[in-house]
Amino acid sequence: MSISRQTLTIVIVTFKSEKVIDNCIKSISDNIKIIVVENSNNQKFKDTLEKKYRNVKCILSSSNLGMGSGNNLGLNNVKTDYALILNPDVILQENTISEIINESKKIESFAVLSPLSEDQKNPNYKIKQNDKKNINNLNPFKVKSVDGFAMLLNVKKINQINDFKNFKFFDENIFLYLENDDFCKRLVDHNEEIYVVPKSKINHLGGKAVSQKFSEEVELSRNWHWIWSKFYFNRK
């Protein structure tokens, strides 16, 4: 299935992700527009990406905005009805996009569709016993939450909900961790539908989104962000 530039935009938030971003972009058709939001002022990174890939627009933030704000910045530049949010350490399979777009035409009421991660250690939705049966049936099934490393957003639909207008999809008070749980919970609270699409599969490397040079620096702040985000999320 050929996907037009008028149908889908891909949004990828990065932070010093030079080591993995190439494999992600190479797995995407060059007919699809990609918006990369780099959470730094790395002009060399921007110039290299835009020169190497004709379908990539790289936006530099003035500072590290975090995942939620970075995604909002990218989504604010989306002009298509659908946006596929990806982590830079995700690799699409041959039919990932065609399968999920095909299901989007069948489930018109959806807010979010998520591909199925082939990484069984870190699947991209909350596993329940009955979900395993649904996976084997290969039919889309409804869930309450999916992880944010790969999800198709019905941008036009979500942007019409009062709580999400003006592309404030993610709570920008959450810098890292649980921003996607919060996003999904707010959608479900508005009676919106979230599905996993088992026929649409991805490979997720997990934990490789930041270059090794900066991994220790990032690791030091992970626990702090996790504790703060959990506290904030539980208080909402």
PLM region descriptions:
Residues 126-150, 156-157:
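Short, flexible, basic/aromatic active-site loop/helix in glycosyltransferases
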Residues 94-125:
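Conserved donor NDP-sugar-binding/catalytic core segment of glycosyltransferases
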Residues 83:
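Short aromatic/hydrophobic "clamp" motif used to bind/position activated sugar donors
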Residues 27, 38-46, 63:
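A conserved acidic beta->alpha catalytic loop
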Residues 185, 189-236:
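Active-site-adjacent helix/loop segment of glycosyltransferases
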Residues 12-30:
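Short, well-formed alpha-helical segments that are part of the catalytic scaffolds
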Residues 150-162, 167-201:
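A short, conserved alpha-helix in the catalytic core of glycosyltransferases
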Residues 61-78:
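Glycine-rich, basic loop-to-helix element that forms the pyrophosphate-binding segment
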